[in-house]
Amino acid sequence: MAKDIREKIKLESTAGTGHFYTTTKNKRNMPEKMLIKKFDPVARKHVDYKETKLK
């Protein structure tokens, strides 16, 4: 079988609330770490989410 191109990642809130989203990304098109602004329901506002490795 071919190796999967899409990698599972965890987007963790920079607000320090512990909230995170899980998603996938294409390793070939985006080799750098992602930084996305998304809604944090614990902080109840939009904050930056940084990519971390999914265990």
From Swiss-Prot:
Family matches, as Gene3D superfamilies: Ribosomal protein L33
Keyword vocabulary terms for this entry: Ribonucleoprotein, Ribosomal protein
GO MF annotation list: structural constituent of ribosome
Domain of life of the organism encoding this protein: Bacteria
Residues annotated as signal peptide: none
Gene Ontology cellular component terms for the protein in this record: cytosolic large ribosomal subunit
GO aspect biological process, one term: translation
UniProt family annotation: Belongs to the bacterial ribosomal protein bL33 family.
UniProt protein name: Large ribosomal subunit protein bL33
Organism classification: Bacteria, Pseudomonadati, Pseudomonadota, Betaproteobacteria, Burkholderiales
